[in-house]
């Protein structure tokens, strides 16, 4: 997830600046945000639904911390979305605002770690990152709407998050009801294969949901370039 975000960042920043003066640039930025969210959701689910396989790769000594992986993935997803919405202060020349937004995130991270880490250990650090990026994202989005309004479709983005949450929830419900105790490496191969196949079906459902939610948006993005 972090690798994809860094790749996107290096490619997107010149892309945004190059089109800043175009008539349909703001609409294009909004559509880019939607596809970015959908692709990050794919990465998140690609790891979450096949977490058993990744657990085999990293070894037994580190499996106790696998539970925080989805939290960290969501955190990095928010970080990437923060990069998208924070382009406003670069495009509007208000880069000094970045300092205050970053400080707000630092305060949240510090407070969560100081208060909760003694009791919850690395879980506090994971949720501290999540809370920090969420606060920074909200602040940046609110300020961006004031100083450099971009017509983000928050309903569509929210629907993508609901879709991601629904797929995660269905997979956990299915695992508890049908595959309790089934794990790669310690269970019969047939049970693991069936479990992973059903998870693949859920991933296909996510694809279908994204196709429905983003229908026509790619053509609209191309139209802004004309």
Language model features with spans:
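Hydrophobic alpha-helical transmembrane segments of multipass membrane transporters and ion channels
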Residues: 34-42, 74, 78, 163-167
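Membrane-embedded alpha-helical segments of multi-pass transporters/permeases
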Residues: 3, 44-52, 71, 110, ...
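Transmembrane alpha-helical segments of multi-pass transport proteins
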Residues: 105-108, 155-221
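Short helix-capping/hinge motifs at transmembrane helix termini and TM-loop junctions
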Residues: 50-52, 58-63, 93, 116-120, ...
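Membrane-interface helix-boundary motifs at transmembrane edges
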Residues: 22-24, 92-94, 145-155
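Interfacial segments at transmembrane-helix termini and the short loops linking adjacent helices
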Residues: 30, 47-77, 83, 182-190
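Short runs within selected transmembrane alpha-helices of multi-pass transporters and secretion channels
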Residues: 6-9, 67-117, 122-146, 199-204
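Helix-loop junctions and terminal segments of transmembrane helices
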Residues: 1-34, 86-91
């Amino acid at each position: 997830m972090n690798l994809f975000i860094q790749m996107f960042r290096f490619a997107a920043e010149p892309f945004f600046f190059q089109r800043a003066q175009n008539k349909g640039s703001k609409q294009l930025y909004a559509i880019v945000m939607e596809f970015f969210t959908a692709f990050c959701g794919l990465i998140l689910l690609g790891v979450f639904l096949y977490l058993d396989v990744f657990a085999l790769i990293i070894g037994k000594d580190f499996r106790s911390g696998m539970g925080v992986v989805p939290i960290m993935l969501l955190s990095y997803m928010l970080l990437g979305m923060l990069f998208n919405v924070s382009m406003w202060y670069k495009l509007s020349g208000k880069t000094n605002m970045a300092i205050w937004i970053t400080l707000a995130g630092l305060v949240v991270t510090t407070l969560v770690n100081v208060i909760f880490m003694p009791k919850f250990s690395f879980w506090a650090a994971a949720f501290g990152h999540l809370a920090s990026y969420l606060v920074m994202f909200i602040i940046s989005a609110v300020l961006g709407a004031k100083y450099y309004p971009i017509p983000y479709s928050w309903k569509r983005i929210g629907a993508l998050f609901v879709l991601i949450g629904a797929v995660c929830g269905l997979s956990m419900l299915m695992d508890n009801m049908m595959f309790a105790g089934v794990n790669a490496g310690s269970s019969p191969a047939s049970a693991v294969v069936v479990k992973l196949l059903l998870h693949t079906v859920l991933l296909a459902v996510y694809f279908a949901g994204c196709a429905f939610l983003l229908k026509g948006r790619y053509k609209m993005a191309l139209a802004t370039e004309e």
